[in-house]
């Protein structure tokens, strides 16, 4: 009897911790607008248009206006004013670029994948 109870509890615990994750490689978490080349660092910056709390959770820092320097933004998306959908991760120290500290300073993000939003 104790063995059956133990097995039943174990099964319940195992299944209660299972949840479905979205592992579809064609989905994007976030949306942003490309702002243009940042004059301080020479790298394009983007402004997230939604999900700022998710950006903060991924990156670990946030800005009031949602602007970040976007390392690894694909060349075909480096056009001011276009809307994009993208996945990001926190940038590693070794991936940071040099900035002049003469202009506005924004946190960096690393773009994993991105594509243009077609209206």
Name each region found by the language model.
Residues 58-76:
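Beta-strand/loop nucleic-acid-binding surfaces
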Residues 77-96:
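Flexible glycine-rich surface loops and low-complexity tracts that mediate binding to linear polymers
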Residues 23-52:
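Structural detector for short beta-strands of small beta-barrel domains
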Residues 14-17:
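C-terminal motif of bacterial Sec signal peptides marking the signal peptidase cleavage site
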Residues 1-5:
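Positively charged n-region of N-terminal signal peptides that target proteins for export
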Residues 6-12:
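Hydrophobic helical h-region of N-terminal Sec-dependent signal peptides
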Residues 91-119:
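OB-fold/S1-family single-stranded nucleic acid-binding modules
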Residues 19, 40-42, 98-100:
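Sequence contexts marking disulfide-bonded cysteines in secreted/extracellular proteins
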């Amino acid at each position: 009897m104790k063995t059956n109870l133990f097995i039943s509890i174990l099964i319940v615990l195992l299944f209660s911790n299972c949840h479905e994750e979205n592992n579809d490689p064609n989905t994007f978490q976030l949306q942003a607008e490309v702002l243009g080349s940042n004059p301080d660092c020479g790298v394009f910056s983007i402004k997230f248009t939604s999900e700022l709390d998710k950006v903060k959770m991924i990156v670990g820092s946030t800005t009031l206006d949602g602007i970040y320097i976007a390392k690894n933004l694909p060349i075909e998306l480096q056009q001011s004013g276009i809307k994009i959908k993208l996945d990001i991760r926190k940038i590693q120290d070794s991936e940071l670029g040099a900035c002049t500290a003469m202009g506005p300073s924004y946190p960096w993000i690393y773009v994993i994948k991105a594509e243009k939003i077609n209206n």
